[in-house]
Amino acid sequence: MKVHFAGFTLLCLCTAVTITGCKPSNDNQSTGVSQDANSTTPPSAEQTKSVKISGAGASFIYPLISQWSADYNAATGNKINYQSIGSGGGIAQIKAATIDFGSSDKPLDSSELTKAGLGQFPSAIGGVVPVVNLDNIEPGKLRLTGPLLADIFLGKISKWNDAAIISANPGLHLPDTKINIVHRSDGSGTTFNFSNYLSKVSAEWKQKVGEGTSVQWPGGVGGKGNEGVASYVQQIKGSIGYVELAYALQNKMSYTALQNAAGQWVQPSAESFAAAASNADWSNAKDFNLVITNATGEGAWPITATNFILMPKQTKDAAQRKATLDFFKWCFENGQKQANELHYVPLPPNLVKQIEAYWASEFK
């Protein structure tokens, strides 16, 4: 089937999962973006000296980094090739020094960074949302508490008309339908944040499953990347999965409301992600190792997540490393509009200053 995106067309062997400016991935093909400016104007002298920057990792950030890449190419002529292969793959590739930067939604601790000779810094903030395939259930209408969500993924609640779900949704007609679980099959920062949240709200989940980029799921079918999970949920009636909000919105999927740590029912949005991030203490987080799920702020979305960029502290190619950092500097200075349009939260100026100071001290 043909899947159309901004400026190009591709042939896809899987069910279409669209993101503006992006393309989907499947188990046999990673997702990448390599953007060229669409112009018949001869390149300037500066553009003929353009560099190619390679990155790989989280599918969580792919919609945003794809748009940043296209706009950066148009502005500078430099080309960003980013492979959406999951956080685990991005960590592995940057450790193997096969790319210029890796991307992960799970921060590495200082000992792992030191062992690998890496530094890390945040790029943007977004949110993980439960998505469902239920007839006549509009986005945001189905309400779930954290413990309910954990019990569903534990397999303890197996029907959509279970009394516990009905109790949280008075007046909402729920079918006598089996709940089909969809989860990630690859190493995933999205999975890390989802399972980290469930571990905070369910002692049973923490004991039986725990948190990680990969976990032993009690049941369900696995999809590769946010793209794969979205595709499976769209195909399987009665299913529930979890994706980054941009994937849910662009594919017109039904997402749930969640009850946050303050007891409020909240909808996923850039505003609720910003509320969750508002009290994040980055200044005391060594190497920016901070997870912000289950935040206590008013209006906070419970599964808010940060994407992190990983780069080697030492390099034999100073010009290439400078070009890579220049890309992210450009994103921080010029990428707020794109972030807002795709429902991510741009980093606040004080955090950007902290990141730039980190670059100066850690990337030699």
UniProtKB/Swiss-Prot annotation:
Record GO biological process: phosphate ion transmembrane transport
Subunit structure: The complex is composed of two ATP-binding proteins (PstB), two transmembrane proteins (PstC and PstA) and a solute-binding protein (PstS).
Residue sites binding phosphate per the record: A58, S59, F60, S87, D105, S188, G189, T190
Region annotation (Disordered) ranges: 25-50
A GO-annotated cellular component: ATP-binding cassette (ABC) transporter complex
Main localization, broad class: periplasm
SUPFAM superfamilies: Periplasmic binding protein-like II
Keywords: Periplasm, Phosphate transport, Signal, Transport
Signal as UniProt keyword: yes
Pfam families: PBP_like_2 (PF12849)
UniProt source species: Xylella fastidiosa (strain Temecula1 / ATCC 700964)
Source organism superkingdom: Bacteria
Coiled coil: none
Subcellular location: Periplasm
One example GO MF annotation: phosphate ion binding
Chain's role: Part of the ABC transporter complex PstSACB involved in phosphate import.
Signal sequence range: 1-18
Family: Belongs to the PstS family.
Name of the protein in question: Phosphate-binding protein PstS
